[in-house]
């Protein structure tokens, strides 16, 4: 299997190829979920395993599962696990809708491809291996409800245009949206390009909208908050 290696801030190696790579949104989501040191975590549609690998890079010691429907993505994740010598991370090649496990998780994340309808472009066809077009927001929320501990957390990043669908899917599956944060490229950008949503299984009804996360400073470099997230 051909791949190249990216190295994260604290030395964790991530195997990637032309289909299974990672971008800024994976870093933002991995940070936003606030995973604690010993919690159990699942990443749905994990691709090359970047989100669980990032958790490990930041010192996470609990069990982390990278679930991916495409066997090539799972193979890349397994290579990364071997290279880094992680014994508390598991790569699973399966469809989340039919995956059965005795594990219950404190935190579940999902970073879906950002298209939902119409004819996908060639690159989008490659990306759809991960879990969409066929996996819906409702599928993710239903699986999360089944696999989360009580009051466990489901964190999703999506395009802002899909926010209503994410909230509806969560509430339909007894996951209460608790925190929303929009991401803007610059503080004067007219519209956000991403939204991060945190929902709790069987949570109470209350919602916090955090201040927008701004990607760039006035000089065009990364903002202080983004630099902290990357490092």
Q: What does each of the following model-derived ranges do?
A:
Residues 13, 63, 88-90, 176-179:
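Conserved beta-strand segments of alpha/beta enzyme cores
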Residues 29, 111, 140, 199:
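Residue-level signal for inorganic ion chemistry
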Residues 112-139:
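Mobile active-site "lid"/loop adjacent to the S-adenosyl-L-methionine
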Residues 188-231:
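SAM/dcSAM-binding transferase cores
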Residues 19-22, 136-185, 190-192:
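Conserved Class I SAM-dependent methyltransferase catalytic core
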Residues 9, 36, 59-61, 86, ...:
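Short, well-ordered coil/turn elements that cap or connect secondary structure elements
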Residues 31-103, 107-110, 116-121:
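Conserved SAM/SAH cofactor-binding pocket of Class I
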Residues 2-40, 46-48, 53-54, 212:
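SAM-dependent Rossmann-like transferase core, predominantly class I methyltransferases
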């Amino acid at each position: 299997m051909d791949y190249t290696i990216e190295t994260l801030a604290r030395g964790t190696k991530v195997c990637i190829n032309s289909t299974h790579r990672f971008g800024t949104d994976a870093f933002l989501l991995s940070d936003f979920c606030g995973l604690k040191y010993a919690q159990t975590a699942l990443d749905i549609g994990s691709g090359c395993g970047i989100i669980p690998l990032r958790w490990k890079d930041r010192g996470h010691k609990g069990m982390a599962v990278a679930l991916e429907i495409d066997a090539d993505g799972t193979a890349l994740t397994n290579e990364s696990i071997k290279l880094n010598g992680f014994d508390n991370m598991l790569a699973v090649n399966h469809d989340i809708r039919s995956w059965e496990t005795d594990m219950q998780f404190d935190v579940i994340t999902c970073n879906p491809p950002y298209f939902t309808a119409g004819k996908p472009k060639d690159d989008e066809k490659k990306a759809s291996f991960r879990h969409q077009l066929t996996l819906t927001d409702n599928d993710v929320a239903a699986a999360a409800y089944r696999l989360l501990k009580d009051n466990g957390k489901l964190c999703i990043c999506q395009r802002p245009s899909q926010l209503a669908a994410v909230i509806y899917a969560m509430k339909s599956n007894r996951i209460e949206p608790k925190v929303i944060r929009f991401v803007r490229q610059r503080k004067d950008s007219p519209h956000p390009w991403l939204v991060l949503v945190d929902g709790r299984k069987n949570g109470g009804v209350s919602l916090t909208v955090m201040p927008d996360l701004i990607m760039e400073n006035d000089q065009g470099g990364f903002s202080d908050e983004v630099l902290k997230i990357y490092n």
